[in-house]
Amino acid sequence: VAEQDLDQLLRQMARTRVNRRGFMKAAGLGSFSAWLAACSGGASQAPASPSAASSPGPAASGSASAAPVQTEGALYMYNWADYISEENIETFRERFGITDWTYDIYPSNEELLTKLQGGATGLYDIAAPTAEFVPALVQGNFLQKIDWSKVPNQQLINEKFKKLWWDPNDEWQLPKDWGTTGISIRTKVVTEDVRTWKQFFEVAPKYSGRIIVVDSPGDVFTAPLKALGYSLNSVDPTELGQARELLMGLAPHVLALNSDTYEEPMRDEEAVLGLTWTGGIDELIADPATADTKYVIPEDGTLYWMDTWVILADPPHPEAAHAFLNFIHEPEIQAKETISNAYATPNDAAKEFIPEEILNDPTIFVPDDIFPRLEGAQDVSTDPLRVEIWEEFKSSIGG
């Protein structure tokens, strides 16, 4: 593809970004309806017996050379909704002869873990857990180590995203993308200049019934703990008790917990204030009809998260799984992921193919002067008091 044509293609894709964790919209079906039909079937169906397929694949600019790949002709993925570029999936299937494709959806890391604990091992090849859940998956024997000789494009990952606490030896996961949790605002309705989590809680009663919140405990605990000046990973009973008061004060004003299509009530002004991720909201900002939408990285601090690609234990199609991991980090392919999902790539080589308007978008690629506000997550999801508060909060929504 000519450089000029590629840039035009990427800019066109940028105008139609989709939510990181939102279900497929009917308008997006097009020639991809066959893929969606496969999604509805899921891995609960008896796997087909695909014939092996091989492909050397075209060498992407900046990507590492790899030997011709022999795949099983099938790949079963368990992932967040709407979290891969449709074009990239079509390209992967065509290049590697993947005729049997399954894409099942989970709405939270907790559900992914629960399904694997319930016996789903061996049903799927690949998943995309958030980084802090990787240790629990390793401990539960739910992952297979990645053979990096089959994923040479791992070398394109920025060093600051390697050998981190959740995988200190880089054995189990490949960074997918990263983003933030923040405040989404329809400014033509919300007239206050909300720049902190503290202000978010203060104005919430005024917009009662018009607040959308992601259905993710780690993200939700971020808001009260940061508003109070604490670590978002706190398990201190006193600090969590204060956070509980803020959350229970917020709960009656929340329209819904929604991790999948939270941008839609924001689009329709059914919700005008949100505790959300960047993806999807970025789409509203780019739409002239909803250009008053704003995404704020709170000044009192917030969560930055990273999602990762993992190969699940006993994968039915291990060669296809490795081929996919290498494919998805080819620079031009990875650039399309960033454009499609509106989340930052850890692959520096991909930035050459990302339009300047996205590279310079501070809600996607967080500037160096804002990054100190961000705090990474630890695995505190099983802390009994946090679990208790979360269940109490969920049961009080809209009440």
Language-model features, listed with the residues they occupy:
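Extracytoplasmic ligand-binding site segments that recognize negatively charged/polar headgroups
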Residues: Y78, Y83-E86, Y106-N109, L123-Y124, ...
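Bacterial lipoprotein signal-peptidase II cleavage site
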Residues: S40-A48
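Periplasmic-binding protein-like
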Residues: L240-G249, A289-P315
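Conserved C-terminal helix/tail region of periplasmic/extracytoplasmic solute-binding proteins
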Residues: E264, D368-G399
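Mature extracytoplasmic/periplasmic domains
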Residues: L312-R373
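A bilobed periplasmic-binding-protein/Venus flytrap-type ligand-binding module shared by bacterial periplasmic
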Residues: S184-V189, L225-G229, W305-A320, K336-E337
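Early extracytoplasmic/lumenal segment of secretory-pathway proteins
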Residues: G62-A136
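N-terminal secretory signal peptides
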Residues: V1-G22, L29-A38
